[in-house]
C-alpha cells in the first residue's frame, strides 16, 4: 500500500515540476525570438519577403510557445491544487520516512522528481555518481527537507521568470511587433545603405523590389555583400530558410482552406439538417412539382418520347406474343416516375441555392478574417510568377488569354453560362447567354491589357516583348 502511495506521489511531483520546466524552456524560446527580431527585419532588405510574412512568422512562433506555456501552466496549477489539498508537509514527511537509502530504484526515482528531464536522461555512470551524492544528502530527515525546499525555491524562481516573460511579451508585441511605424522605421534604417527612398508599407508590400533609381539586381547584390562582410551569412541563411518555409506553408494552407473549408461546411450543413428540412418543406407545403418552365418543357418532351417508345414496344410484343398489353397503365407508371424525378430535381435546385449561399458566405468570412494571409498568398504567387523565365511567363499569359478570350472561347463561355443557369434553376434564355458571352470576355480582355500596360510593362518589359512576339 505504501509503495502505491509512493508511486502516486512520485507521479504528481514529476508531472508538477516537469510542466513548470517545459513552460520555462518555452519562455526561453520567446526571449530568443525577441532577441532575433531585428535580424528578421533585415531580411526585408533583399525584398524577397513581405513585411506581413515576417510579422506573421514571428507572431506564429510566439503563439506556438504561448500555447505550450499556457498548457503546461494549466497542468501545473491543477496538480498544485491536488498537492495543496494533500499538504506539502505530509508529502515531504512521507517521502523522508519511507525512502530506503539502499534501494537504488527509489534513489533514482527521488532524483527524477527533483531533476529536469535532460538531467535524468544522462548516462548511467553519471546517474550512479549523482546517486552517491544523493545518499549522503538523505542521511537525515533534516537534509531531505533542505533538498525539498531547495528544489521548491528553484522552481518558484522559474515560475516567476515565466510570468515575467508573459507580462513583458504583451508590452513587446504592442510596441515592437504590432507597431508598424517602428517596424517600418527599422526596415528603412537597414535599407539606407542601399539608397532606398520609399518607405515600406505594411499593407502594400510585395514579394519583389519596388521600382526605383537603382536596379534591383544591384541592391540585391549589395545586400548579400553586406551580409558577408558582417559575418552573419549563416544566421541569415537559416532565417531566410525559415521565412521561405513559413511563406510557402501559409500560402498553401490558406489556398486549401479557401477550397475545402466552404465545401466541407456546405456538406455538413446539407447532411445534418438542410436536405431533410427542404424535402419536408417542399413535399408538405408545396403542391407543384416543377420550379420553372424549363422543367415542364423537358418533362413534356420526355413523356412524349416514352409514350412513343411504349407504343413501339407494345406493337412489337403483340406481333411476337399475340397478347395485348395495357398501354394506359404503363404510361401512368412512367408518368409517376417522371414526377418523382422532377420533384427531386426541384428539391436539389433549392438545396443548391442554400448551399451556394453558405459557401459564398464562408468564403467571404475567410477572406475578411484572413486579410494578412491573403496578402502573404498574393506575395507568394507574385514571387512564384516572377521567378519564372520570360518565355514561361509569356506562355502562361498566352494560354490564359486563349482559353478565356481567344477565338474558340465563346463556345466555352456559352456552355459554362448554360451550366450555371441550370445549376441555379433558371430556364435557358439564348438572349441572356448571348449578351453575357459577348460582353464578359471583352471586359476580361480589357482588364488584361490594362494589367500588361500599367503593371507588367513597368516590372519586366522583356515579358511584354516576348508576349507580343509569341502572340504574333
From Swiss-Prot:
It is found in: Plastid, Chloroplast inner membrane. It comes from the Eukaryota. GO terms for molecular function: antiporter activity; proton transmembrane transporter activity. One of its GO terms (cellular component) is chloroplast inner membrane. Pfam families: CemA (PF03040). One of its GO terms (biological process) is potassium ion transport. InterPro entries: CemA (IPR004282). Keywords: Antiport, Chloroplast, Hydrogen ion transport, Ion transport, Membrane, Plastid, Plastid inner membrane, Potassium, Potassium transport, Transmembrane, Transmembrane helix, Transport. The chain crosses the membrane at residues 249-269, 349-369, 395-415, 432-452. It is a multi-pass membrane protein. It catalyses: K(+)(in) + H(+)(out) = K(+)(out) + H(+)(in). Belongs to the CemA family. Contributes to K(+)/H(+) antiport activity by supporting proton efflux to control proton extrusion and homeostasis in chloroplasts in a light-dependent manner to modulate photosynthesis. Prevents excessive induction of non-photochemical quenching (NPQ) under continuous-light conditions. Indirectly promotes efficient inorganic carbon uptake into chloroplasts. This is Potassium/proton antiporter CemA. It comes from Chaetosphaeridium globosum (Charophycean green alga).
Amino acid at each position: 500500500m505504501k509503495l502505491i502511495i509512493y508511486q502516486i506521489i512520485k507521479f504528481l511531483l514529476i508531472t508538477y515540476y516537469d510542466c513548470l520546466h517545459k513552460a520555462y524552456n518555452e519562455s526561453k524560446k520567446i526571449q530568443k525570438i525577441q532577441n532575433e527580431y531585428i535580424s528578421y527585419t533585415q531580411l526585408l532588405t533583399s525584398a524577397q519577403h513581405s513585411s506581413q510574412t515576417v510579422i506573421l512568422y514571428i507572431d506564429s512562433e510566439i503563439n506556438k510557445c504561448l500555447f505550450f506555456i499556457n498548457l503546461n501552466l494549466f497542468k501545473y496549477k491543477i496538480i498544485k491544487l491536488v498537492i495543496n489539498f494533500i499538504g506539502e508537509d505530509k508529502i515531504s514527511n512521507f517521502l523522508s520516512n519511507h525512502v530506503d537509502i539502499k534501494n537504488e530504484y527509489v534513489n533514482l526515482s527521488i532524483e527524477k522528481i527533483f531533476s529536469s528531464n535532460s538531467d535524468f536522461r544522462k548516462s548511467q555512470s553519471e546517474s550512479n555518481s549523482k546517486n552517491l551524492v544523493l545518499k549522503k544528502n538523505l542521511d537525515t530527515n533534516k537534509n531531505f527537507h533542505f533538498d525539498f525546499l531547495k528544489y521548491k525555491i528553484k522552481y518558484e524562481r522559474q515560475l516567476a521568470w515565466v510570468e515575467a516573460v508573459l507580462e513583458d511579451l504583451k508590452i513587446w508585441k504592442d510596441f515592437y511587433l504590432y507597431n508598424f511605424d517602428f517596424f517600418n522605421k527599422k526596415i528603412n534604417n537597414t535599407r539606407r545603405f542601399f539608397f532606398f527612398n520609399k518607405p515600406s508599407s505594411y499593407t502594400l508590400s510585395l514579394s519583389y523590389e519596388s521600382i526605383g533609381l537603382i536596379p534591383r539586381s544591384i541592391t540585391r547584390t549589395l545586400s548579400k555583400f553586406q551580409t558577408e562582410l558582417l559575418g552573419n551569412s549563416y544566421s541569415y541563411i537559416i532565417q531566410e530558410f525559415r521565412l521561405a518555409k513559413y511563406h510557402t506553408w501559409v500560402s498553401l494552407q490558406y489556398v486549401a482552406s479557401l477550397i475545402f473549408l466552404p465545401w466541407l461546411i456546405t456538406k455538413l450543413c446539407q447532411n445534418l439538417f438542410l436536405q431533410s428540412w427542404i424535402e419536408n418543406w417542399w413535399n408538405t407545403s408545396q403542391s407543384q412539382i416543377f420550379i420553372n418552365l424549363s422543367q415542364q418543357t423537358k418533362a413534356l418532351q420526355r413523356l412524349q418520347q416514352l409514350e412513343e417508345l411504349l407504343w413501339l414496344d407494345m406493337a412489337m410484343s403483340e406481333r411476337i406474343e399475340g397478347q395485348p398489353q395495357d398501354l394506359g397503365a404503363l404510361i401512368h407508371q412512367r408518368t409517376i416516375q417522371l414526377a418523382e424525378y422532377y420533384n427531386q430535381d426541384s428539391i436539389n435546385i433549392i438545396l443548391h441555392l442554400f448551399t451556394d449561399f453558405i459557401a459564398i458566405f464562408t468564403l467571404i468570412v475567410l477572406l475578411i478574417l484572413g486579410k494578412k494571409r491573403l496578402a502573404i498568398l498574393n506575395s507568394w504567387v507574385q514571387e512564384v510568377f516572377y521567378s519564372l523565365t520570360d518565355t514561361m511567363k509569356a506562355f502562361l499569359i498566352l494560354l490564359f488569354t486563349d482559353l478565356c478570350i481567344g477565338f474558340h472561347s465563346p463556345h466555352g463561355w456559352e456552355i459554362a453560362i448554360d451550366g450555371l443557369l441550370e445549376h441555379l434553376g433558371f430556364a435557358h434564355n439564348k438572349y441572356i447567354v448571348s449578351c453575357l458571352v459577348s460582353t464578359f470576355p471583352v471586359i476580361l480582355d480589357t482588364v488584361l491589357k490594362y494589367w500588361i500596360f500599367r503593371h507588367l510593362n513597368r516590372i519586366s518589359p522583356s515579358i511584354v516583348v516576348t508576349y507580343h512576339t509569341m502572340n504574333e
